[in-house]
Every structure is written in C-alpha cells, then in structure tokens.
Amino acid sequence: MKKPTAIFLFIMLGCQLVSGSSDSRTAPVTDIDADVYDAGTQETTQFGVKINNTDSLTAGDRGPTLLEDFMMREKVMHFDHERIPERAVHARGVAVHGYFQSYEDWSNITAAKFLQDPDTKTPVFVRFSTVLGSRGSPDTVRDVRGFATRFYTEEGNWDLDAIKFPDLIHAAKPEPDKEVPQAGTAHSTAYDFFSQHTETIHTVMWALSGRGTPRSFRQVEGFGVHTFRFINEDRKTVLVKFHWKPLQGLSNLVWDEAQKIAGKDIDFHRNDLYTAIENGDYPEYELGVQIVSEEDQDKFDFDLLDATKIIPESLVPVTKLGKMVLNRNPDNYFSETEQVTFHPGHIVRGITFTDDPLLQGRLFSYTDTQLNRMHSANYLQLPINRPLVPVHNNQRDGFMQFNVYHGRVAYYPNALQDNTPSVVSEEEGGYLEYPENIRGRKQRGKHGKFADHFSQAQLFYNSLTTHEQQQLVNNFRFEVGKCDSKLVRQNFVDVLNRVDNNLARRVARGVGVEEPSPVSENEGETTINLSIENYKRPDHIRAKKVAILTGPGIDDSQVKEMKDYLTGENAYVDLVGLNLDEDNSEGLNITQTYSTTSSVLYDAVYVPSGEKRTFEILTSPRPEFPYDEPLMFVLDAYRHGKPIAVSGRGLELLKSAKVPTFNGTDAAANHGIYISSDVSNLASDFRKGIIIQRFWNRMALDHDAKKSPTSSHIKIED
C-alpha cells in the first residue's frame, strides 16, 4: 500500500505546485498544431518521454520481456489499433488537393458565392476510387469509378459525390461463402442480380464499356448522378445535373491490358496521378451543369429523378461553370485520404436537394457508414473534414472530442448568452430552403417513367462506335462467361436482347447459351459525347508515357534525337534496356529493363535502328528476358492499339514479334505504325499518333457485327 500512496502524494504535490504559481493564468495546452514534422527530431513516447533504446526491456540477455516496459506496451498497443474499418464501398482510393475557379458570375441561377466571383480560388480535395474492391485491390479492375470532390467554400463545405445502392453492392461484391472474386463482377451472383433487376442494365453497359477501365484518373469524366436544384437570391430555382469534363480528354484500357497492368503495377492509377502532379502536369477538369427549368422537368421520356438515367447532351448541353486544377499530393495518406468523409448532404447555400429516391437514401447511409468507420460523431473535426469557416453550434462531447468549448450555454434559444450562437435568416445569408409542394400517397415499387429500363441502355450502345461495341461484346463474353450458372448466363443474355438483338446474339455465342430472337426494335437513336473514341483530344502529348527500346549496338543518335523531341513536348520517356543505369555513347541512362516494365504501362513505343546483332540479341532468349519480353513488348503494344514508331532495322523486332507492318508507310500509319529512318519527320508523325491514342481499326470484328449508327471521327482541339 505504501507505493501507491507515494504516487498519489506526488500527483497531489504537482497540482499544488502549479496552483501556487505566481502566474495569474496558465496558457492553454489545447491549442495544438496538427502538422507533425519528424525529420531532425528525437524519438519520444506518445507522452513525450524521450526513448533511449528501441529494444524490449528483458530480464538478462535471454530472459523474458518485462511487463513494466511501458515503451514496448505503448508501441504494440498503438500498432494493434492503427487500422480503421475500410469503406463499405469505394475502399480503394487516391486523393489530391487543388482549387476551383468559376468562369463568371452565376448568381442568376445560384446563390452559392463560390460560383459568383471569377477571382476566387476555392480549395478542393478530390478522391478517385473504385467501388467494389478492398483497400488492397488493384487500380485497373473493371468497375464504376468514384469521383468525390469537396469544395472548402466561404459558406461551408460542399461535397459532390456518387455511390450505388446496397443490394447491388452485395451482389457485385465477393460471394459470401468463399469471398471470391475480389474487385470484380465476373461471377454468378452479380449477373443474377443484374438480370433480376433490369434497372441496372444501363449502368452495367457503362461499366463493361471502355469507361469501366480508364487509362488514367486524369482522363475520366465525373457525374453527379443525381438531379439537384440551384436556387438564387430571388428564390428562383432550376434543376441541374453536374458533370466533370477532363481537359486532357478521355482514354481507356482494353481488358487484356488492364489485367496485365494489375500484375505489373497494382498502384498504376495512383502512381500516374502522383507523378503528373509532382512533375507540374496538373490534371484539369471543367465543372459543368445541364440546366432544366422547373417547367420543363416533365417534358422528357425519362424521369429526371431517376438516378439510373442521364440527360442526353444532344437534348440539354452542358454549361461550363468553371475549372478545377489538381496541384498538390497529400502529405499523409491516412490522415487525409483515408479519414476524409464525403457526404451528399454536405451542401452550401444556393444548392439544394430533389426527391431523387436514391439521393434520399444516401443522405441517411453516409452518416451511418461514417459513424461506423470513425467510431465517433466528432469525425467532422478532423483537419481534412473541417470547413475553412468558423463552426458554432450546440453539439457537444462524444468520443475523441477535439474542441475545448467555453461558456455555460449549449442550447438554443437562451437568455444567458443573448441567444447565441444565433440562427441566420435567409436574407442575411442563412441557408436557402426550396418551398416545394409535396403531394401523393405512401407506396412502394417503381412507377411511371421509372419503369423504363432499356431505352437509355440502347441509346448508350448506339452511341458507341463499331469498334467500341466490339470491346463491349468481348467484355461481356469474359464477364458472363465466368458465371458458373448457365441459367444466369441465359437470363442475362435475354436482358441484353431487350437492348439490342445483335449484341445479345454475339454475347450468347461466346458464353454457350441459346441465341435469342428479336423482341424489340432498335431505332438507332444516338447522342453525343458518350463515345470515348470520338471525344475531343487536346493537341499535346504532355504527361504521355513513351518507351524507347534499346540494346547493345542500338543507334544512340536516334535514341537521343527522339528522346529530346518527346521530352521537349513534355512527354515522359523511359529507355528500356538489358540492365539499369547503363550509359550509351550519348550519356543516356537506361531507366527500365525488359524484366521491370512492359508496354502496358506506356502510351506509345519507339524502336530505333541499330546493328544487326542488336536485334539478334533482342529476338533471342536470354537471362535478361527469359520470356521473350522485347517481342511481347511490341506485340502487346500493337494488340492494345497503341502507336508504334520504328526506324531502320527496328522493323526486325516487329517482324519477329509478328506485328503487321502493312504494305507501304501510309497504310501502316493509318494503323498507328510509323516507319522512317528520318527521326525528325518520324517524331512529328509519332506525336500525332500519340494524340490519337488508340488505333482500334487493328481490332478484329465479329463476322456478324452490325455497323454502329455512330461512326468513328477523331477530333483534335485547334
């Protein structure tokens, strides 16, 4: 009993010493900066005690670890609790900082201040993600991507986010009996759900197209999914659908390429985004809205409140409100990317909700899931979640309360604190409510225009080019072919048949089920800006990745000339060789080897000329490339539609890989193969090919593939 008494007396003595100080008041210890910089410091415990040794405290050289080792106990305890529950969906993600700047004053349609001053740069935090996979899943799986954006405005935080509903996620997630497959829908429960819930077919068509496997987060569109309302100071409202339009254009991976990248670089999209920002090649997106007046909301063949539908841009064009620039990577992944908590209910003055049923469900779901992940109602006080404006309300206490509130009042109205924090009228800047008339009876089920599940799936299919439709067919053959239930395969093909008979018959043939007869007519209706192939491309190759293949005896002057040209155009160039750090006569280092990289990680490939022995080496088995990596490098680049430039004897590598070189340079160039020993002329043509990105005319088409009503038309910005 004596030892505990001594400790108690020591604590009491410490309290007496502090209270007896001559200082009238002690400075608060709660005003602590959240930023921590460890470089050049000394290691301490969590309580600030300097650590003298990181080995465990033991009884003798070989004795047991002592329980009194408080340093070891603290370290192990903290390690055991470092992980928090991952997100139920969108667990795999990457986030970056940036800013948004309005193009002009949009006060005619919204009271949101950040959309009224073109000189104001509003900070943003953007998280890109997959939906189905866990935190450790690959980046390049086929999935609907998340594109969540937080605007830190002068009127509070606004989150622009997207997600799907629970049953869909349960069906698409790994099957619960054996927890496979990871991060993919190529299994029976997913397609059983899709065939039983035909309202999903429009989303499934998008996911199985090239949009389900983007090349880069710098080249994806973002969609607000739901219909929201803008409300201005005069209480006038319009309905809006939000869009993010990438200024670097759109680009996608083919499925074979995406699978190989998952094995070569599981963090492919993360690395791509991080590298571009570190190099100053900042991703840029325009925020746009499709605007529909309250009077016109019922004039469409679909319901604006149906989140499974889009407003075709041929009916309502996108009005560009401003531009977002992403220019800074996070300082700490966990503190920022993992702890950020997006919520569609985080809106600001001038923006309000509609009766979209999926949106209404999300308003509950997000709060619930964030409480489960963060284990505290105070997660909004975390640095990444705090608004830039002061927060004053009567919400108190809870686990991990970070704030130290002063005063005796925590309620409203009150007399002791002159009714503060006070409410703010709409006229003085309070939130603007939309006075919507509500009528109707309580009921369940889908009614009216919500019951149309196929017209927009057909519109999407018709708006793809013929080669994009072939990719869709190929992808369905893979996914549906993975379903072990023939009943599920047949049911889903029957669903596809209600979209397009030619599509359904081609898929059916590949998955071993009966080819259906037509049940409806495809009228061939199309709309704009759904085809990736026809999406306008920027007239530059900034941040495009190009591999230059080398070997002993390669023409160093051609290597240097092409590399200098490409880097001058702000492309990223790797020299691929037998061993790292080898210098050629021009002093150019080998940055990758044939065993460390692959053409799937690049946008284009150049093969210079060289000595005869150069290509004898590159086309023969060697320890440096035991699996014919140089041959596979150019063959995969060709199969995946990428531009290939070649000089002189470099053609030997293509021929050995059985890459077609066509009859004549013009025919080859039409298929993205650029052949010339004049590197200056070759480089210019190669640049055009890199801008085009993919040459889908190399892809074989089904013998019975119908020509799409949407023709291929390459558009490059002026």
Predicted features, each with a name:
Residues 20-553, 560-572, 577-596, 606-610, ...:
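Active-site-adjacent core segments of small-molecule enzymes
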Residues 667-716:
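A charged, well-structured terminal subsegment
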Residues 558, 616-618, 654-657:
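Short glycine-/acidic-enriched loop or helix-start segments at secondary-structure transitions
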Residues 2-21:
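Gram-negative bacterial Sec-dependent N-terminal signal peptides
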Residues 552-556, 650-652:
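Gly/Ser/Thr-rich loops at beta-strand to alpha-helix junctions
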Residues 485, 604-610, 626-656:
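Catalytic nucleophile loop
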Residues 591-594, 598-605, 657-682:
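Structural recognition of alpha->loop->beta junctions
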